[in-house]
Every structure is written in structure tokens, then in C-alpha cells.
């Protein structure tokens, strides 16, 4: 089948499950939501190489593909989004990539030992490479000192940073991501992770 036919088939599959998905979201029936989404998620993975997540936004339902760094999946997710039927778009917002501070980000929690942290507990220290137009970042969480595995802390920092600012800005402006167990002593710019999107946009708009 062509990519166009695959996209049509996917949205037909989604439409067949749409009432069940919407009911589960509205009633916050998460086990029911998982059951309703499972075959559609499998279809998305087979056809685009990525999954998606759904949310009950303020006045509309929202669906977001999560293609990660894979360029083919990014292309297919955007193509599928562009072909979403108008009937679905009457009730749904459909995003081809992870958006800044989505509901998923707002609700994200990280458990470290006996402590639970949200994005509000994370800070990012950063410098701007003016020549490359990128940000060199270090993410701090009070619980990082309790984790011995450096790779795990770096992966967590990368994931949460992308969750906070969205995939588009992450790929366009983040030059490096690292972690710190304690706030750095040298003078660098910093902000809460939930405020980093605005900080990036302020710098980008100022320099353009």
C-alpha cells in the first residue's frame, strides 16, 4: 500500500475506536483507555514507526505523535497529521510531534528513592553558543545526588528537557544536555525547567 492509503487506513481505524477513546478520556477510565488505544497504537507503530498519546484538553481532545529523533517517523507522523479527516478535527487537536509543556509534561513524575519529583522541581543551567545558535544545558534536580548511574541521569535529563520544550525546539536549539548533582558555582543563566521554553524564545527573538 502507498503511504496515503496507510494514512487513510489508520484514521479509519482510529475513527472506529473514537467514541470508546473519548468516553474513556472523559470518564478518566484509564484501564478502558489502554484497551481502546491498544490496537490503534499497534497500527501507528506498524505504519509510522512511532506511537502516540492522547489527552483530554480544556475544550478538545488532543492526540500527539511521538516520533522521537527518527526522521522517517517524523515525516510519516507529519504526513498522517496532515491527512487527518476534518470530522475528527472537529473534536480533536492532532500534533505531529511533542509540543511544549503538554499535559503529559505537566503530569510527569519521577520517583527517586522515596521522593517524587515533577518538572517544577527541575532547573536548567545554560549558556548560549551565539555562533551555532544553540544552548548548552545542564539539568539539576535535588534528587540527582541520590542516583549513582550517570547515564541514567543524563537520559532522564534529555527526556524531561524535550518534554518541557517540545521536540521542535529541542532539535533546533539544544546543542548539548548534561546533568549536575548540585547547582554550579560559576555564574550562568538558569531557570525552572517549566520556564525554559520561554527563555529560549526570548533569546531567539532577541537575536533575530
Please place each PLM-identified region on the residue numbering.
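Glycine-rich, aromatic-bearing surface loops/beta-hairpins
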Residues: 141-208
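Well-ordered, non-membrane alpha-helical segments in soluble/globular domains
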Residues: 30-40, 74-77, 153-162
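Long, low-complexity, Ser/Thr/Gly/Pro-rich intrinsically disordered segments that act as flexible linkers
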Residues: 1-25, 53-54, 94, 98-101, ...
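Aromatic/basic-lined ligand-recognition segments
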Residues: 89-147, 201
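Short linear interaction motifs
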Residues: 44-48, 59, 115-120
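Aromatic- and glycine-enriched beta-alpha-beta binding-site module
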Residues: 52-102
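Short glycine-rich, basic-tinged beta-strand/loop micro-motifs
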Residues: 12-23, 58-67, 133-146
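Surface-exposed, low-hydrophobicity interaction/linker segments
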Residues: 11-51
Amino acid at each position: 500500500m502507498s503511504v496515503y492509503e496507510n494514512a487513510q487506513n489508520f484514521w479509519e481505524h482510529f475513527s472506529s475506536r473514537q467514541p470508546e477513546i473519548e468516553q474513556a478520556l472523559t470518564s478518566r477510565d484509564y484501564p478502558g483507555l489502554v484497551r481502546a488505544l491498544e490496537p490503534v497504537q499497534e497500527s501507528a507503530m506498524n505504519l509510522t514507526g512511532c506511537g502516540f498519546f492522547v489527552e483530554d484538553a480544556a475544550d478538545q481532545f488532543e492526540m500527539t505523535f511521538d516520533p522521537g529523533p527518527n526522521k522517517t517517523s517524523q515525516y510519516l507522523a507529519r504526513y498522517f497529521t496532515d491527512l487527518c479527516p476534518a470530522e475528527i478535527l472537529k473534536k480533536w487537536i492532532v500534533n505531529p510531534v511533542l509540543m511544549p509543556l503538554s499535559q503529559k509534561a505537566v503530569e510527569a513524575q519521577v520517583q527517586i528513592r522515596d521522593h517524587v519529583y515533577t518538572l517544577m522541581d527541575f532547573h536548567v543551567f545554560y549558556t548560549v553558543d551565539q555562533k551555532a545558535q544553540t544552548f548548552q544545558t545542564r539539568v539539576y534536580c535535588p534528587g540527582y545526588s541520590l542516583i549513582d548511574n550517570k547515564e541514567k541521569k543524563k537520559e532522564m535529563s534529555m527526556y524531561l528537557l524535550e518534554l518541557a520544550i517540545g521536540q521542535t525546539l529541542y532539535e533546533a536549539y539544544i546543542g548539548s544536555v548534561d546533568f549536575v548533582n548540585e547547582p554550579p558555582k560559576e555564574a550562568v543563566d538558569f531557570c525552572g525547567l517549566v520556564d525554559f521554553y520561554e527563555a529560549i524564545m526570548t533569546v531567539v527573538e532577541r537575536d533575530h
